[in-house]
Amino acid sequence: MIVGRVKEVWRYPLKSMAGERLEGSPVGARGLYGDRGWALRDEEAGEIRGAKISPALMLCAARYRAEPAAEGAPPHADITLPGGAQTSTDDPRVNDLLSDLLGRRVTLWPLRPASDRAHYRRAMPAARLVGFLSRSRNFRRLALGAMRLAGKDKELREDFGREPGEPLPDLSALPAEIFEFTSPPGTYFDAFPVHLLTTASLDALARRAPDAAWDARRFRPNFLVETSGGVEGLVESGWGGRTLRVGGLRLRCEMPAPRCSMTIQAQRGLPKDPRVLRTIVKEAGQNFGLYASVESAGRVSAGDEVELL
């Protein structure tokens, strides 16, 4: 079934900064070549972090100087700071500039090999033990439930931007390694290598909250799919377990994407708008968009058909 066409292709050279809109890109097991090739380490917390360091990170933008390869170190990227000042990943001042902007000590890192597990490990005590136990989905579900009952879910509520009385998302379907590491080792994406969003979903929530600032850029998808006539509503939320053919690529639809506080923050060209997340929590079951993994590599370009198999 043809569900639409690729309207936009996006790559994000530096985790949590504004990305690059592309005409097309090769996609491998780790997603679009060069996607999230760089990230910041919060030296005070002792781990890799995204916009939870400071929402100001989302007011920055990054652009590669050269096209990335499938493997190996990412190319250097130019960075535009709020107000228009320029720096880059190879600027000797970049760590100081970003630390001053964010109000805490940070350092910039390219992707490290997956074997460098210490680089990706969470700073929390007993991260290795938690990672081992989290191989069981039942443990993940019970542990999150116990945190809620014990009132120890404050950090989760802050990260996910939940107000009192709002539910927390069910994170038990996320990869087990996310409970030990800040991202799957060898990557800087949150959970899965590809994130997809449809115009049908955007339109559906815009109808429910027409005064909110709905814009695909706010949700940082790799692919924005313009859905065909007759395809309406939160369609991708029902695609879990199915396969998508996107251009020359085949994707396995893994799970709906749980949304966090990043969606309400001001970004380049977009205002801060808490109504966005309030609507997602109330009207979309806390999820918006789709996480996917790569079944077979290929190239995707704007205009390519998207087929649900």
Where are these regions (language model features)?
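Metal-cofactor-dependent catalytic cores
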Residues: 1-309
